[in-house]
Amino acid sequence: TPSSQFTRAPQATDGCVAVANPDLERIIRTVEIRTTPVLIGKNLSWVRPDKLASQKKQFSETLQTWTNAKRNGRENELLQFYASDFSADGKDLNSFSMSLRAELKRPGSKPASLKDISLIRWSDEADTMVATFGEIPDGEKVGRTVRQYWQHRPGGWKIIYEGLV
């Protein structure tokens, strides 16, 4: 935003989020860039963590089962976690599954553990969970940061998107 203009006209951002300079300066001082999630919505309702404990436990068990399937190279079990309408970076489930199979069979690839798991859940048209985590190969100190979008579907949670942050 130009310094002479405090706010932008409605719909002048072409789909981007516009924040007034003083607010942006406060955000920069307050949050850790690339690790603090930003939620944008019409109606946000904060819920006490203890009210969500059982739901978090149930989803965490699902995520751990996904992790175990990937760690152990069980590709058929792993692919059961992905929704039929999955898409990621222009790949449908079929294309993505070929990449995933190649990753699992790559010589020298090490099993990985999840670290710094962040979960954000909301319900609008669908019950959605965003899981962001570090995927650290065993014996390494650093890895990659993965973000997955899961939706609760008949039969359980399914991944509808997966990509690197």
Task: Please provide the spans of the model-predicted regions.
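Exported/periplasmic cell-wall-interacting domains
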Residues: T1-Q64
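A structural boundary/capping signal
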Residues: R48, K70, A112-L114
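Short, well-ordered alpha-helical segments enriched in acidic and aromatic residues
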Residues: N72-D89
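Surface-exposed, charged secondary-structure patches
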Residues: S99-R147
